[in-house]
Regions:
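Conserved short alpha-helical segments that host acidic/polar catalytic motifs at enzyme active sites
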Residues: 1-125, 130-195, 200
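A glycine-rich phosphate-binding loop feature that marks nucleotide/adenosyl-phosphate handling sites
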Residues: 195-206, 227-229
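Structured, non-catalytic alpha/beta "coupling" segments that mediate domain-domain communication
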Residues: 125-127, 208-214
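ATP-dependent adenylate-handling active sites, centered on carboxylate activation for C-N bond formation
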Residues: 185-187, 256-260, 276
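Short, glycine/charge-rich flexible loops or terminal/linker lids adjacent to PRPP-binding catalytic cores
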Residues: 214-262, 272
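Extended, hydrophobic alpha-helical segments in both membrane/secreted and soluble proteins
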Residues: 197, 205-211, 219, 260-277
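Conserved small/polar residues in nucleotide/adenosyl-binding loops
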Residues: 278-285
Length: 289
C-alpha cells in the first residue's frame, strides 16, 4: 500500500498475516479511518500513518507493540527504507550490500545474489533496520520471542532451494528430510518396497534425492510440470482443483510402467496429484511426505 500521510509519503510491502487484524481494523474505523480493502497490510499502513512520534522509527516501534502475527515488512518513506521483522521470526527477511554501496532487502537470499549483493544478513526477529544514504542502523524494537517460531513450510515448500535462512540452505534441509523419512520407513517396512522414487516437482526433488540415496531405490522423473499453471490447492472447488492438477502435471508412463512407485511430496492435502498415477501404467503407488 502507498499513501500520503501527515508525516510524508509512506509505502509498505508485507509478507505474513496478522491474527489480530480484525480487532485493529475495528479500532481504526471507530476513529474514523476508512478502508478500501480487507487486507491486513492496509491496516498496518493506516496504523503507521496515524501514529504520533517524532520519527518513523518511533511510529514503527509503537505499531509493532500492537501487531500480533507474522510480518516481514519493507517500509519506504521519503528519506529512508526500513526492514522490519516480527519478534517470532515467522517469515524470512534479509539485507544485502549492493556493488555500488547501497542496500537491497528481500525475502530470499537468492534475489540478493542475483543483484550481486555481498555481506548478506538476516533481519533478526524484532528488529527494525533503517537504510539511508548507504548507512545501516539496527534497532531492536521488540525482544525476540524465545523460542522463535520460523514457519516450517518455508523450508518444506515456500522457499527457493538456493535460499539460505538463518545460515541453513533450504535444498540441504529438504534433502536431509528425505533421508530421515527413508530411515523411518525402512525401519518399519524393510528395504524391498519400491522400484523407483519420483518427486512431485519442484519442491520435493531434493527430498526424493535424499530418499533415494538412503534406500538405494533408483530416482527418476515421473511427472512433467506445466510451469504456466499456478497453485491448484487454493482453488475453491474440488472439480477446479482436479482440473488444475490435470493441466499442471503429466505422468511419464515409460518411467513408471509396471513398477512399484514411491512418490515423494512436500505435503498431501487431497491427494489429487498422486491420483494421476492410478490412471497410468504404474503397478503400485506409495506416497511419502
Amino acid at each position: 500500500f502507498m499513501i500520503e500521510t501527515m508525516h510524508g509519503p509512506l509505502a509498505l510491502a508485507h509478507n505474513g498475516n496478522l491474527i489480530n487484524s480484525a480487532e485493529l481494523r475495528n479500532e481504526l474505523m471507530e476513529q474514523g479511518v476508512g478502508f478500501s480493502s480487507s487486507s491486513d497490510t492496509e491496516v498496518m499502513t493506516m496504523m503507521l500513518a496515524r501514529n504520533g512520534g517524532g520519527t518513523w522509527e518511533e511510529r514503527i516501534k509503537t505499531a509493532m507493540a500492537k501487531w500480533i502475527g507474522a510480518y516481514s515488512l519493507v517500509i519506504l518513506t521519503r528519506d529512508c527504507v526500513y526492514a522490519v521483522r516480527d519478534p517470532w521470526g515467522f517469515r524470512p527477511l534479509c539485507i544485502g550490500l549492493l556493488p555500488n554501496g547501497g542496500h537491497a532487502v528481500a525475502s530470499e537470499t537468492g534475489a540478493l545474489q542475483t543483484l550481486g549483493c555481498e555481506a548478506i544478513r538476516d533481519v533478526k526477529p524484532g528488529e527494525v533496520v533503517s537504510l539511508s544514504n548507504s548507512a545501516l542502523k539496527v534497532m531492536q524494537a521488540l525482544p525476540t520471542v524465545n523460542p522463535t517460531s520460523m514457519c516450517i513450510f518455508e523450508h518444506i515448500y515456500f522457499a527457493r532451494p538456493d535460499q539460505v535462512w538463518d545460515g541453513i540452505n533450504v535444498h540441504h534441509v529438504r534433502q536431509r528430510l528425505g533421508e530421515e523419512l527413508a530411515r523411518e520407513i525402512t525401519e518399519k517396512m524393510g528395504s524391498d518396497f519400491g522400484d523407483v522414487v519420483i518427486p512431485v516437482p519442484d519442491s520435493s526433488v531434493p527430498a526424493a534425492i535424499g530418499f533415494s540415496h538412503v534406500t538405494e531405490i533408483p530416482y527418476n522423473d515421473g511427472f512433467i510440470k506445466n510451469r504456466y499453471v499456478g497453485r491448484t490447492f487454493i482453488e475453491p472447488t474440488d472439480s477446479l482443483r482436479k482440473r488444475g492438477v490435470a493441466l499442471k502435471f503429466n505422468v511419464i508412463n515409460e518411467n513408471v510402467r509396471d513398477k512399484r512407485v514411491v512418490v515423494i511430496d512436500d505435503s498431501i492435502v487431497r491427494g489429487n496429484t498422486t491420483c494421476l498415477l492410478y490412471t497410468s501404467d504404474a503397478a503400485d503407488e506409495r506416497s511419502s511426505v
